[in-house]
Curated annotation (Swiss-Prot):
Co-factor remark: Binds 2 magnesium ions per subunit. They probably participate in the reaction catalyzed by the enzyme. May bind an additional third magnesium ion after substrate binding.
Positions that bind DNA: R47, R71, E159, G232, D234
Keywords recorded for this protein, A-Z: DNA damage, DNA repair, DNA replication, Endonuclease, Exonuclease, Hydrolase, Magnesium, Metal-binding, Mitochondrion, Nuclease, Nucleus, Phosphoprotein
The organism of origin for this protein: Entamoeba histolytica (strain ATCC 30459 / HM-1:IMSS / ABRM)
Protein name in UniProt: Flap endonuclease 1
Length: 376
């Protein structure tokens, strides 16, 4: 899920809200990672010219497992403490968008099959990413590995970005690592894109600051949310003919979608039964747990468990897996460890003015990895 054209719009109207950097600048930070985005990257990136992903001897896809293993090791070696957040059940308002994605994926698969049959490698390469999808089984495999590595995993009530944002608001994490810009719309003060422990010279990490966005644009949080709805989100349609710049200028002039609709020219077509109010409510009050008293725990590495899972069950190279485990075990002896001691003392982020005014109270999670569901 994302906000269409938001990054380009911010580059124009709030350029100071984004800064580029390298992974070592996040040493000593706790980062909430949108797990579905990360796993998708591994599934879509590690594919050959036949369209196949990395598989074991039984033909099972394994790129997401080994990719997560080495990426997590690199993050920890960089002095970062990652938390992985997995998607829960999507909101009903997203059903329409999910249906569109399914149809598009089916069309892309048909085009990919044709390109492969014709030997068009360039076209096939372009289509591979559009057909990559993370299954529940793959998600469970990644969770199992992370738990063996001692890394915290949280299954969100709803979408992962909302829970990542809630962790940042509660002061448990510094930033949300995702490619989806709606993490800002959901209230994450810091959002980092291109978050990789690899060499970032060609594609540096990009960090966005929500408070800087609001300061530079002069918008309130509610106005920023309305802007994002006008730009295009997964929860509802947009006004046809209203592009990014027009959307920004309309919010700047009229302050809210309600006022915009009262003054909007007839040349623009407003969707019938437009559910912008419901979309706004989902952004303002996402289905998340209350993390104010939540304690994040990084457990000891289960060395034998990792070997059994990766080598015995998944048939990865034992020597390489052992080297990875040794790197994890040796992190404490590195200089980065001195900075890790401050991880549990992250300051809490206070409620926004709108939340404070409305008396919002966020729900408390259970001590289990999975968030507690709302009581009916």
């Amino acid at each position: 899920m994302g906000i269409k054209g938001l990054s380009k719009l911010l580059a124009r109207y709030a350029p100071k809200s984004m800064k580029e950097g390298k992974i070592d600048q996040y040493s000593g930070r706790v980062i909430a990672i949108d797990a579905s985005i990360l796993v998708y990257q591994f599934i879509s990136a590690v594919r050959d010219t036949t369209g196949a992903t990395m598989v074991d001897e039984f033909g099972e896809t394994t790129s997401h497992i080994i990719g997560t293993f080495y990426r997590t090791i690199k993050l920890i070696e960089s002095g970062i403490k990652p938390i992985y957040v997995f998607d829960g059940k999507p909101p009903e308002m997203k059903d329409g968008e999910l249906h569109k994605r399914k149809e598009n994926a089916q069309k892309a698969q048909e085009q990919l099959d044709k390109a492969l049959e014709e030997g068009d490698k360039e076209q096939a390469k372009k289509l591979m990413k559009r057909t990559a999808r993370m299954t529940k089984e793959q998600s469970d495999e990644v969770k199992k590995l992370l738990q063996l590595m001692g890394i915290p995993c949280i299954e969100a009530n709803c979408e992962a970005e909302g829970t990542c944002a809630a962790l940042v608001k509660a002061g448990k994490c510094y930033a949300t690592a995702t490619e989806d810009m709606d993490a800002l719309t959901l209230g994450s003060e810091h959002v980092v894109r291109k978050f990789s422990a690899n060499d970032n010279k060609k594609d540096p990490i990009r960090e966005y600051s929500l408070s800087s966005i609001l300061e530079e644009t002069g918008f309130t949080m509610e106005q920023f949310i309305d802007l994002c709805i006008l730009l295009g989100c997964d929860y509802c349609e947009t006004i046809k003919g209203v592009g990014p710049i027009t959307a920004f200028e309309l919010i700047q002039q009229y302050k809210s979608i309600e006022n915009i609709l009262q003054h909007l020219s007839d040349k623009y077509k407003v969707p019938e039964n437009w559910k912008y109010k419901e979309a706004r409510e989902l952004f303002l009050h996402p289905d998340v747990a209350d993390f104010s008293d939540y304690k994040l725990e990084w457990n000891k590495i289960d060395e034998e468990g990792i070997k059994k899972y990766l080598v015995t069950e998944k048939h990865f190279n034992e020597e390489r897996v052992s080297k990875g485990i040794e790197k994890l075990k040796n992190v404490k002896s590195k200089k980065a460890q001195g900075r890790l001691d401050s991880f549990f003392n992250v300051k809490k982020v206070p409620l926004s003015k709108s939340e404070a005014a409305s008396g919002v109270k966020r729900k408390k999670p259970t001590t289990k990895a999975k968030e507690s569901r709302k009581k009916k």
